[in-house]
Amino acid sequence: MGYYTQYVFTIEEGPEEQYRSMTREIDGILSCDDLSLYESVYAKWYDYEEDMERLSRAYPEITVRVNGDGEDSDDLWQDFWHNGKRFSERVRFADYKDIKDKLN
């Protein structure tokens, strides 16, 4: 089955040609040409974390930001990858019960 996510890639620092090589490798993993052309791909990427850890080690001079927007409305996140390491942030939306007193 699977779950679709919109992945948007941005190079934060490092050689542009290495970044282009990385996006071409990701196109190969996902069997598409979207990422190297548009820096964005809507896909089911089952091994995202393992693949990105491996790729960021293969291209240790670059830092990449990946923004994700999943099928569920509350699935928004961003990851920064550099030399096999990841810094991850997730958006957390408040529940109504947690904020209803702020509306009065």
Spans of features found by a protein language model:
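Charged interaction segments
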Residues: 23-104
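Short, extreme N-terminal segment that most often corresponds to the first beta-strand
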Residues: 1-27
